[in-house]
């Protein structure tokens, strides 16, 4: 155990909807309630209009779950265009137009939003910084925080690149998503992680995995993640290092798994909540009451 480290109180526990990517929002909310999560993320495709967004907000509040992030926003860089042959269901997930995205975020009462680059296109650092800063400025008018997510198969492939963008933009409402899968399957850099201030890591997304990828990286991240404690990674050590940072944000779970999706919503939520709390307890975290 690593309880000798001074760790921060976890501000909340988020059920990231990617865990039940193919399920309707109502089932994801049922899972979040069953797992004792304090917040839930929403996809833009969940809300074809603001009326639906208001309905999801009311539904969540009635169950005692706050809507946290609207995830993801991808139309923030020059030349956004979906590649030929992209699956329609993936385009529905990532293709939301900017005005519609921000209208939805406001209607939901979302407190944050995720920004990522979905197609693996490379951009100069100047374009990345300028684009991220512009998103932060627009979001700030609605009191929304913006967290940038890196993925090893995207145009923002690692923590180093993402942190450089966040630092270059230098916006108070701009920070990072730290997804354990993306970090450990990419270029993990403990020395760099140690230098990043806790307040710049807005959210932590937790999942475990096999030591080596099962299939391609995309297949591994979309279908073969595991619950914390069911894989081969030292998540306890990683979480303890993260939680030792003063001002670290919310911690949540995002486990995209074929085997998990065979279960019902309540069992998925319960297993996710139990696994995440067990890991946080082992890492020495003080959980929200």
Model-found features: residue ranges?
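Histidine-acidic metal/acid-base catalytic patches
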Residues: 1-33, 61, 109, 159-174, ...
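Active-site acidic/histidine proton-transfer and metal-coordination neighborhood
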Residues: 5, 24-26, 81-175, 286
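Active-site beta-loop-alpha junctions enriched in small/polar residues
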Residues: 16-20, 43-47, 72-75, 118-120, ...
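N-terminal substrate-binding region of glycoside hydrolase catalytic domains
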Residues: 31-50, 71
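Conserved beta-strand positions in the central sheet of alpha/beta enzyme cores
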Residues: 41, 69-71, 114, 147, ...
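Glycine-rich, proline-tolerant flexible connector loops at the mouths of alpha/beta enzymes
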Residues: 41-61, 119-120
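Alpha-helix-loop-beta-strand connector modules within alpha/beta enzyme cores
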Residues: 57-74, 129-140, 169, 233-238
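A short acidic, helix-capping loop that chelates divalent metal ions and anchors anionic groups
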Residues: 76-84, 119-122, 186, 259-263
């Amino acid at each position: 155990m690593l309880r000798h480290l001074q760790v921060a109180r976890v501000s909340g526990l988020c059920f990231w909807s990617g865990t039940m990517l193919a399920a309707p929002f109502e089932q994801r909310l049922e899972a979040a309630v069953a797992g004792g999560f304090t917040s839930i993320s929403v996809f833009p495709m969940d809300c074809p209009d603001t009326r639906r967004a208001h309905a999801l907000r009311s539904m969540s509040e009635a169950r005692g779950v706050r809507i946290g992030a609207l995830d993801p926003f991808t139309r923030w860089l020059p030349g956004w265009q979906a590649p030929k042959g992209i699956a329609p269901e993936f385009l529905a997930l990532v293709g939301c137009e900017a005005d519609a995205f921000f209208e939805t975020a406001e209607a939901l009462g979302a407190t944050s939003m995720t920004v990522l680059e979905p197609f693996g296109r490379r951009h100069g650092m100047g374009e990345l910084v300028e684009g991220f800063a512009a998103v932060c400025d627009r979001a700030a008018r609605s009191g929304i925080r913006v967290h940038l997510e890196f993925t090893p198969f995207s145009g923002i492939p690692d923590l180093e690149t993402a942190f450089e963008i966040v630092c270059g933009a230098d916006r108070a409402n701009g920070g990072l998503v730290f997804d354990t899968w993306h970090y450990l399957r990419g270029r993990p850099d403990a020395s760099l992680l140690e230098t990043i201030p806790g307040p710049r890591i807005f959210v932590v997304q937790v999942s475990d995995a096999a030591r080596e990828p099962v299939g391609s990286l995309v297949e591994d991240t979309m279908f073969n993640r595991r619950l914390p404690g069911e894989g081969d990674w030292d998540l306890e050590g990683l979480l303890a290092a993260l939680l030792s940072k003063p001002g670290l944000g919310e911690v949540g779970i995002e486990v995209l798994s074929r085997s998990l999706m065979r279960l019902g919503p309540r069992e998925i939520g319960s297993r996710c909540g139990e696994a995440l709390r067990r890991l946080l307890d082992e890492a020495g975290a003080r959980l929200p009451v």
